[in-house]
Regions:
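Acidic, low-complexity Ser/Thr/Gly/Pro-rich repeat segments typical of extracellular/periplasmic
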Residues: 1-157, 161-175, 187-193, 199, ...
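Extracellular interaction modules
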Residues: 200-207
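An amphipathic, aromatic/His-enriched active-site/gating alpha helix that lines ligand/cofactor pockets
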Residues: 184
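Acidic carboxylate motifs that coordinate Ca2+ or other divalent cations, activating on Asp/Glu
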Residues: 181
Length: 260
């Protein structure tokens, strides 16, 4: 019984503003679909906004309406790309609107430069959640401190495409992001990088990056993983520790801990 299974992906019926809108200065984007949609379970992980927006906007789907509410002022004269990947699905059959991207500019034109290429690895396959990251900052350690300006997810075949980029000089990295924060801050995260600044003044079609797992011989504590819960200090190091718990003592002096 029952009719033929619906396999048709959902369709965008309308949006405000329209896709590729210029001179956008509002705080909200609204997109309407032709049918009810599944809610997003983790928008910050499912939606890529490039350039990066902090704080991350409120993104939710209610019935057939998707809303994006920005919490702060956007940068002037900048093209923004909001990429949903394969995370827009209809409510009934889970049919996917694949690779949907919404563009807008806070200026009078859409930036149109692209950087494309491939990421290689010695592993059997590209790790899940591998991204290519572009930074405007020139220091070579920036990927351990800040979220990227532009970001693109690497496909399973290793290809990537960063689109609608403003001309300029960038640091470029690839990162197998284990914890979804777009920083290199875990010892199990593979990275790749270009040795020098990449100057984007025209399209780049064949940028190649090779992932590797850094061999860090210095014992380090990752700053973002210093947490205290219930009187227990949790520290994440960049390598395994070889002492037993009976060998470790600490002396607390004011705000400092001395570990002999």
């Amino acid at each position: 019984t029952g009719g033929k299974k619906d396999t048709t992906p959902p369709i965008v019926k309308s949006s405000y503003p329209t896709n590729a809108q210029l001179n956008f200065h509002q705080k909200q984007i609204t997109i309407h679909f032709n049918e009810w949609m599944q809610p997003l379970t983790n928008p910050k992980a499912q939606v890529i906004i490039s350039p990066n927006v902090e704080p991350f906007p409120k993104i939710e789907i209610i019935k057939n309406e998707l809303s994006i509410k920005f919490k702060d002022t956007l940068q002037p004269n900048t093209t923004y790309s909001i990429y949903f990947g394969d995370n827009l699905k209809d409510n009934n059959e889970g049919n996917t609107l694949s690779n949907y991207k919404f563009l807008f500019s806070t200026g009078s034109f859409i930036d149109s430069l692209n950087v494309k290429g491939s990421v290689q690895t010695a592993l059997d396959k590209i790790p899940d959640n591998t991204f290519v990251l572009l930074y405007k900052e020139k220091e070579d350690s920036v990927f351990t401190k800040k979220r990227p300006f532009y970001i693109s997810k690497v496909q399973t075949d290793g290809s990537f495409s960063l689109e609608n980029i403003k001309d300029g000089a960038y640091r470029i990295y690839a990162l197998s992001d284990k914890n979804g924060n777009y920083y290199y801050d875990l010892p199990t995260e593979s990275i790749a990088f270009s040795d020098s600044l990449t100057h984007v003044s025209s399209n780049i079609d064949s940028l190649n990056l090779e992932l590797f797992l850094p061999e860090d011989t210095t014992l380090r504590i990752f700053e973002k993983d210093k947490t205290i819960k219930g009187g227990i200090l949790h520290l994440t190091f960049n390598k395994e520790l070889s002492f037993s718990k009976d060998e470790l003592t600490a002396t607390i002096i004011g705000n400092d801990a001395i570990i002999p």
